[in-house]
């Protein structure tokens, strides 16, 4: 303890109010001794202040601690960087526990590291632990170490780091640039601004996690049909930790009183790939017996083969007078049928949500992606880029990476990198999206990639991104796409005073986005990830909707023309369409304008999904409630988009994800006092952000219902792409793309 300074009184005062488990080490002293430890740290480890302060944190290590993970921490400290690892640590009494440790440096304004903050989260019951190592070859459906870093550690680390920064007299957010290196899902600087870091979309793994049911998922394509996912409720019921469950067959729940005939029925159903509901006596880890109304349901792939088995457990045990005796079954037949129905409904919900997570079982899941140049589509008939690429393909047989020269990186998303590339020997530029095949398979994102590829191949619209070709190597996929000089609408928004646009400009962008969404719905697609980051600005200034990996592609649309008479789609008044005969539907001219004014094009997908996907601030209430959702989620997101473009923030954003969700579900819509917005615009937003999906504008007749709203009066829908955009990027501008361009590309806005 000699020579180790006591923690500053201000540090102790500030940190004492935090209930998290963490320590603070002094980076200016040899061996980085601990100068502060929270009460939570003492409680978790069993050590006292005299045994902790002045020592390095390595006293928590033991025989099972992985030296490779320890080396990651040492390397990060040496470089002054952040890192996040999962370590097997030991309490003072020798009890091992899994510790999700996140180390974050605190830097002074001159860039010198003064402190290291180490946040610990006991994830023993949540992590997969050694399941991967002990059951080699068992691919887990959800990688929990990554999920815990993103969903549990991130907010705790933010709380502690900001508190230490304040105590150190450092402007909050100074450490964040370094902290972004840690795999916590937080990218870019923290701050108080609504868009201080990119909003990462929630994926299909979140769907499974959020299903509030007692269930597990097994993979029949692997020997002995091992469990690859177990819900928290399943772990609570059985008393097992996730590490003890993953990679094992479900038979460990059987015991002395389990009926062998019932077990044989389950085995036969697995062999046949059929659905089954039975009542079986199971046992918890502690040996307590319980009646389990067990439903087994196959989740099939596109070929009809069972890709996963969902096992739903419903505890139907009556209160037993003696915990030592097996419970007696005394339910009536009607009660038993009701419980069985409950399990079957839950299994159906889970299977539906899982559809998007089933990666192809073929040896090469990427075989469906063609390497040839896409067919030339009508809206690109005169595109010089198509012509140049076709000539190269005819000359060399196929497109190769050698045909392109990398100019610079445009951005990095959740599943890949985007580079600006130039075709060798020409001035033609493209955006190349690169994905690591192995990472996509490891993270269960193959289905997402295939969905995006299929949608890009199918669409042809002036307000949607264009895919020219896909180049495959042994390790990577490269999507060669149309390059947009203006970058993201997100960048334009951030470059404006107070991060907001003029109402007439918002109307222009909203009308083009609405038209793009209408086209996607016409093809049976639900977009599901609308936000400024996914709206690109073409060199002409018009929008291009991009990123379709979270879209729902299993719906279908049967377009029909319906006579509306005197009652219109919006607000009970007849839609006011321009005199052009094609302006209402965006289609070709047929018949007189007078005739078409009395008809409406209905083209909404008959789609019903349960996946929990999208960006949290833009999620519709029905997505959060897991009640199943359809195309109306896109109209909710359109309302959020219009609100954000006008006010510079989203209406329901909270400090935490769960707070945001709570606001979306329960809080009323409130408009800021500034800037002044027209009554028609506020009315449109209110009607789009109706929490009852059945009453939401657009839920009855789709996009035309929204187009007929008074706020869009005067928009010539048929000639949108020929109108002058509010901002036209300079093609010679060096600030070529992505949100990294700042405001440099928007000087002429």
Curated annotation (Swiss-Prot):
AGC-kinase C-terminal domain sequence ranges: 713-749
Entry keyword set: ATP-binding, Chromophore, Flavoprotein, FMN, Kinase, Membrane, Nucleotide-binding, Photoreceptor protein, Receptor, Sensory transduction, Serine/threonine-protein kinase, Transferase
Matching CDD domains: PAS, STKc_phototropin_like
EC number(s) given by UniProt: 2.7.11.1
Database matches in InterPro entries: AGC-kinase_C (IPR000961), Kinase-like_dom_sf (IPR011009), PAC (IPR001610), PAS (IPR000014), PAS-assoc_C (IPR000700), PAS-like_dom_sf (IPR035965), Prot_kinase_dom (IPR000719), Ser/Thr_kinase_AS (IPR008271)
Cofactor binding: number and manner: Binds 2 FMN per subunit.
Record-annotated active site: 529
Pfam families reported in the protein's UniProt record: PAS_9 (PF13426), Pkinase (PF00069)
Classification via Gene3D superfamilies: PAS domain, Phosphorylase Kinase, domain 1, Transferase(Phosphotransferase) domain 1
Membrane topology listed for this record: Peripheral membrane protein
PTM characteristics: Autophosphorylated in response to blue light irradiation.
Tissue specificity statement from the Swiss-Prot or TrEMBL entry: Expressed in gametes, pre-gametes and gametes generated by pre-gametes (at protein level).
Chain ranges of the PAC domain: 81-135, 274-328
Name recorded for this polypeptide: Phototropin
Protein's organism: Chlamydomonas reinhardtii
């Amino acid at each position: 303890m000699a020579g180790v300074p006591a923690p500053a009184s201000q540090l102790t005062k500030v940190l004492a109010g935090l209930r998290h488990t963490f320590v603070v080490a002094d980076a200016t002293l040899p061996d980085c001794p601990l100068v502060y430890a929270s009460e939570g740290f003492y409680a978790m480890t069993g050590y006292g202040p005299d045994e902790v302060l002045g020592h390095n944190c390595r006293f928590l290590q033991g025989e099972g601690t992985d030296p490779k993970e320890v080396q990651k921490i040492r390397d990060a400290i040496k470089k002054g960087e952040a890192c996040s690892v999962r370590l097997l640590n030991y309490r003072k009494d020798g009890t091992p526990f899994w510790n999700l440790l996140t180390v974050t440096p605190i830097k002074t304004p001159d860039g010198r590291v003064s402190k290291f903050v180490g946040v610990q989260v006991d994830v023993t019951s949540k992590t997969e632990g050694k399941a991967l190592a002990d059951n080699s070859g068992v691919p887990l459906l959800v990688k929990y170490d990554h999920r815990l870093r993103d969903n549990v550690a991130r907010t705790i680390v933010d709380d502690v780091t900001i508190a230490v920064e304040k105590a150190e007299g450092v402007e909050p957010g100074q450490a964040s640039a370094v902290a972004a290196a840690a795999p916590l899902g937080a990218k870019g600087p923290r701050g108080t601004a609504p868009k201080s870091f990119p909003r990462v979309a929630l994926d299909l793994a979140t769907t499974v996690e959020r299903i509030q049911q007692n269930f597990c998922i097994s993979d029949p394509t692997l020997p002995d049909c091992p469990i690859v996912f177990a819900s928290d409720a399943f772990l609570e019921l059985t008393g097992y930790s996730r590490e003890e469950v993953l990679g094992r067959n479900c038979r460990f729940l059987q015991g002395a009183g389990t009926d062998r005939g019932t077990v044989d029925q389950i085995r036969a159903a697995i062999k046949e790939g059929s659905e089954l509901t039975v009542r079986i006596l199971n046992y918890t880890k502690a040996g307590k017996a319980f009646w389990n109304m067990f439903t087994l349901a196959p989740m099939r792939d596109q070929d009809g083969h069972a890709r996963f088995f969902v096992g739903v457990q419903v505890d139907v045990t009556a209160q037993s007078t003696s915990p030592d005796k097996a419970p007696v079954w005394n339910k009536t037949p009607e009660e038993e049928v009701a419980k069985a129905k409950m399990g079957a409904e839950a299994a159906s919900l889970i299977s539906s949500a899982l559809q998007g997570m089933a990666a192809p079982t073929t040896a090469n899941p990427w075989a469906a992606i063609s390497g040839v140049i896409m067919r030339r589509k009508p809206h690109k008939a005169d595109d010089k880029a198509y012509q140049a690429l076709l000539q190269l393909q005819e000359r060399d047989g196929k497109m190769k990476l050698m045909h392109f020269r990398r100019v610079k990186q445009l951005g990095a998303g959740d599943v890949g990198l985007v580079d600006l590339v130039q075709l060798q020997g020409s001035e033609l530029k493209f955006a190349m999206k690169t994905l690591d095949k192995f990472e996509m398979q490891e993270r269960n994102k193959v289905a997402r990639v295939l969905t995006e590829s299929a949608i890009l191949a199918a669409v042809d619209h002036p307000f949607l991104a264009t895919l020219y070709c896909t180049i495959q190597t042994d390790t990577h996929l490269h999507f060669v796409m149309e390059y947009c000089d203006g970058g993201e609408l997100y960048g334009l928004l951030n470059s404006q005073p107070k991060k907001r646009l003029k109402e007439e400009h918002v109307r222009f962008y909203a009308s083009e986005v609405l038209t793009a969404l209408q086209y996607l719905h016409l093809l049976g697609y639900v977009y599901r990830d609308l936000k400024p980051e996914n709206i690109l600005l073409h060199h002409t200034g018009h929008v291009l909707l991009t990123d379709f990996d979270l879209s729902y592609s299993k719906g279908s649309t049967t377009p029909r023309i319906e006579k509306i008479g005197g009652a219109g789609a919006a607000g009970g008044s007849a839609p006011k369409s321009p005199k052009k005969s094609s302006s209402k539907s965006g289609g070709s001219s047929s018949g007189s304008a007078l005739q078409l004014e009395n008809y409406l094009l209905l083209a909404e997908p008959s789609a019903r999904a349960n996946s929990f996907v999208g960006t949290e601030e833009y999620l519709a209430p029905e997505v959060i409630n897991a009640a199943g959702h359809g195309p109306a989620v896109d109209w909710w997101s359109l309302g959020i988009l219009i609100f954000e473009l006008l006010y510079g923030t989203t209406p329901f954003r909270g400090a935490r994800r769960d707070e945001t969700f709570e606001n979306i579900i329960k809080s009323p819509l409130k408009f800021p006092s500034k800037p002044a917005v027209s009554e028609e615009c506020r009315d449109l937003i209110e009607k789009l952000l109706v929490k009852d999906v059945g009453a939401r504008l657009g839920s009855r007749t789709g996009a035309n219902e929204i187009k007929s709203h008074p706020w869009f009066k005067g928009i010539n829908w048929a000639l949108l792409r020929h109108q002058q955009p509010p901002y036209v990027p300079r093609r010679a501008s060096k600030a070529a793309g992505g949100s990294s361009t700042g405001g440099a590309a928007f000087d002429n806005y």
